Amino acid sequence: MAMSVHCDIVSAEEELFSGLVEMVIAHGHLGDLGILPGHTPLLTDLKPGPVRVIKQGGTEEVFYISGGFLEVQPSMVKVLADTAVRAGDLDEAAAIEARKAAEKALSEKGTEFDYGSAAARLAEAAAQLRTIEEMRKKFGGRSR
């Protein structure tokens, strides 16, 4: 049996996952992170995108986070997300529409234009679509 570490994935609204995992994979601001049991203690911020957990036995579950923090301690990994959902619960049509609306806002700058807000909405929609695409590649279109 492979070694495992306890993992919690929580958002401001709820705890989405709590259990033993063999590995956690997330997108940090300096690149991808792969956390295995025995990893050195770490605290880092996370970019919007997928967080993958490989559970005991090798099954994998994918979550989308809108950003947050990753804390690693000797016996646990904790993902503290601003917003988090199971990747299978993402609405692809809504993410595409949000991306189009943000792109339109960026191209039609008006007097009340907030570039930072429009860019953040575009980045979040793009991260959701990347998560959906990664899940499709990994699971062949099946939701997990």
UniProtKB/Swiss-Prot annotation:
GO terms for cellular component: plasma membrane; proton-transporting ATP synthase complex. One of its GO terms (molecular function) is ATP binding. Keywords: ATP synthesis, Cell inner membrane, Cell membrane, CF(1), Hydrogen ion transport, Ion transport, Membrane, Transport. It is found in: Cell inner membrane. Pfam families: ATP-synt_DE, ATP-synt_DE_N. InterPro entries: ATP_F1_dsu/esu_C_sf, ATP_synth_F1_dsu/esu, ATP_synth_F1_dsu/esu_N, ATP_synth_F1_esu_C, ATPsynth_dsu/esu_N. Its main location: membrane. It is a peripheral membrane protein. CDD domains: F1-ATPase_delta. Produces ATP from ADP in the presence of a proton gradient across the membrane. HAMAP family: ATP_synth_epsil_bac. Belongs to the ATPase epsilon chain family. NCBIfam families: ATP_synt_epsi, PRK00571.1-4. This is ATP synthase epsilon chain. It comes from Ectopseudomonas mendocina (strain ymp) (Pseudomonas mendocina).
